[in-house]
Regions:
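Walker A/P-loop NTP-binding active-site region of P-loop NTPases
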Residues: 290
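An often Trp-containing, charged/polar helix-loop segment at the C-terminal end
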Residues: 195, 240-245, 294-349, 369
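Detector for glycine-centered tight turns/loop "hinges" at secondary-structure junctions
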Residues: 201, 272-274, 331, 346
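Substrate-binding/charge-relay-adjacent region of secreted/lumenal peptidase catalytic domains
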Residues: 1-193, 222-223, 227-279, 284, ...
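Short acidic, Gly/Pro-enriched loop/turn segments at secondary-structure junctions
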Residues: 197-204
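Extended ligand-binding clefts on enzyme/binding-domain cores
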Residues: 208-221
Length: 369
């Protein structure tokens, strides 16, 4: 997550228009959001919805491990960003926010609680949290959390995860390139970031990288690269090589992207103050809101489900990702000494297949589920 210091900014509803989301308000859907700090503040959401001109959605907060749901510890920026992005696009959807502790068991319980919630029954989950997979995570923790994400995929629940905001370095600073987990899990839709302007009514977009790509230096960049933990899934037939010497042929992230630059950020209200925030942690809930709209249009009993593999399937010689996303071909996420990754024609490790063309994605999904 990164704060914008200047305009332009967008309401999430405006981005839904830029990205040609199918019409709708998310009625009948529940979007789950997983948080590990901060809190939900109804007055902020009410004020946001007044600015955005949308109805105030119903929000449920669920505490796990006695985690507070209304704490002001700095992470409320993240919580309110996630909720407000979804609210702007799907004001008639229910939003369920699961608060837990940032521990291995806390992660597992939060994902399990959302995926197996028989009362709220979310069809899509948004996660804006993570850390470099080969830094503070243990192998056991990654594998255990990944099993919970696998359960989500098997149950047809789409999990959208932010790919990180510090470029190829991922905030580690050891000279090597890193991937964020759980974005690197093969069972999630990993969401990267772009920098978006609208000129003469048309989007102009490139890979998100502000400054040197590191938040500690006042910049930021989309996370993305090649996993050192997860082998490349059979369904991910792409030609991307790790910049780390001797690395495995791992899972490549992100799968897709959306606006994330702090300088072209998302309008939010936090602690009573209106402003703009960016980061892939805004792009992930935007994709979750898109999926909620798509789910609302599908026949009863059908939903998007495990989306990532579908994007790599070929239909009439082109992948669904290529036909359902607008390709981003400029920019890079280089922030590590070893290097990073560049956008190119087709799939790449900075914006994946690109940003959504929502109506085309909805049509493609309808033909597959």
């Amino acid at each position: 997550m990164a704060r914008a210091t200047a305009r332009p900014w967008f309401y999430s509803s405006e981005l839904a228009s830029v990205y040609d989301f199918p019409p709708g308000d998310g009625a009948g859907q529940t979007v789950a959001i997983i948080e590990f700090g901060g809190g939900y503040f109804p007055n902020d959401l009410k004020q946001f919805c007044q600015y955005a001109g949308v109805a105030v959605p119903k929000v449920d907060t669920i505490s796990l491990h006695n985690a507070p749901t209304n704490k002001k510890d700095g992470a409320e920026d993240e919580v309110m960003l996630d909720i407000e992005v979804v609210a702007g696009v799907c004001p008639k959807a229910k939003i369920a926010v699961y608060f837990s502790k940032f521990t291995e068991q806390g992660w597992i319980d939060a994902i399990d609680a959302a995926v197996h919630d028989a009362v709220r029954q979310p069809s899509v989950v948004s996660i804006s949290w993570g850390w470099a997979e080969d830094d503070s995570w243990s192998t056991g923790a990654i594998d255990a959390i990944n099993e919970s994400l696998k359960d989500a995929a098997l149950l047809g629940v789409t999990v959208c995860v932010a790919s990180g905001d510090d470029g190829s370095d991922d905030g580690i600073g050891d000279g090597h390139a890193h991937c964020d987990f759980p974005a690197s899990s093969p069972y999630v839709l990993a969401v990267g970031g772009t920098s978006l302007r609208v000129e003469n009514g048309k989007p102009v977009e490139k890979t998100w990288k502000d400054g040197d790509g590191l938040r500690k230096d006042g910049g930021g960049a989309t996370g993305g690269g090649v996993s050192t933990h997860f082998a490349r899934p059979q369904w991910q037939k792409v030609s991307v090589k790790s910049v780390n010497p001797g690395s495995i042929q791992g899972r490549v992230i992100p799968d897709v992207a959306a606006d994330a630059s702090a300088s072209t950020g998302y309008f939010t209200v936090v602690d009573g103050q209106a402003g703009a925030i960016g980061g892939t942690s805004a792009a992930a809930p935007l994709w979750a809101a898109l999926i909620a709209r798509v789910n609302a249009k599908l026949p009863s009993g059908k939903r998007v489900g495990y989306l990532a593999p579908m994007l790599y399937q070929k239909v009439s010689k082109k992948t669904i990702g290529a036909t359902s996303c607008r390709d981003i071909t400029t920019g890079d996420n280089i922030s590590a000494a070893i290097g990073g990754y560049r956008a190119k024609k087709g799939f790449d490790a900075v914006t994946g297949w690109g940003v959504p063309i929502g109506s085309k994605l909805a049509a493609a999904i309808a033909g597959q589920v």
